[in-house]
Amino acid sequence: MKRLSLLIMLFFALPVLHILSPANSLAQDEITVISSDAQAQFPTAITFRLEAEATTEIADIDLEYRPSRRSLIPVSCRVDVDFTPGQRVAASWTWDMLETGGLPPGTEIDYWWLIEDAAGHQIGTSSDTIKFDDLSYDWQSLGSDQVTIFWYKGDLSFAHQLLDAADEALERLASEVGVSLEQPVKIYIYTSSGDLQGALVYPQEWTGGVAFSDYSTIVIGVSPGDLTWGKRAIAHELGHLVVHQEVFGSYGDLPTWLDEGLAMDAEGELRSDLQGMLNEAIAHDDLFSVRTIASSFPTDPDEAKLSYAESYSLVQFLIDNYGSDEILALLDVFKEGSTYDDALLEVYGFDMDGLNALWRESLGLGPQPTPTPGAVSGISSPYIALIVVVAILGILTIYFALSFRRRM
């Protein structure tokens, strides 16, 4: 009787044992990750690789990744990875930054995989992290409370002087404008413009430094023999980074004269060569208007230098006459997405034309002469006329050709 009872219990227990068996348990037991890694090819790519196996065919693999950057809402990117389905698979995907744009050195990227088999079992792997480092150089580092300098050529004194220049620029921005770093900054010092451009994706030939505000990182080219320029360049890029962090999440952009003027202010006194250009332009009443340099600077090198000098002068005019609190208020209004004119009207009571008139008056000048020097349209009147004539001739040629074809 006892034997019969035991057999009956085993009979009814079999379905339960079947349900609890490894072959039918949670998805984690259905799909196994053999390996997962990522390899950086700085500065152009990162390749993510996965090997996995399952009791049934693996049908779908997605990769999700998220660079460590400042954002209003953490957002990850998801990629449907191509691979050959099977019970044991190898999958890989390369993030081609020549297509998407690059990342600064030192950026950390979190990534994880989502795997599904043909039976519908799914797993998500735990997050891994890859650091996107430039391994071409043997980096040293030196830091303060807010800034860390990374460099590979030059002695410790070289790095100390650059670090001091960065700290002084931050103090200047805090005292004169009222803006400060939202998070510590990393500054990578490349010893030449060639080395710097080799660390960037599609750099401009004239690029001397770049501030990656969302990543709180600056990359810049400074040789030990060009320390004076390097100090100014670091201060300038820090100015951009701090201001952009201040208006982070804005719906619009800053006028170029304000963005560059604040960065120039971070450097300290205006460079003597730029001051000379500004003085000459004032003497000949040959200044660009505020509106002219609001959207972009001229491409001509000398006109661009004058635009930088004017931007510095404009920011100094606003600070000297209205105080740093108003500059900070102006940045706050721009953060809300206000237009250039509306922001100035809200904070100061005048628009760009009004600012232009008051600034010129402070320099001893009358109303803005027209036209302003070196129009920034980039195309002179004779070329515009030539383009119009060519366009008209082209239209006439097409018209007569079609008319002739209809007669045929």
Summary of predicted features, one role per range:
Residues I61, G124-S126, Q161, G198-Y202, ...:
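Short, solvent-exposed loop/turn and secondary-structure capping segments
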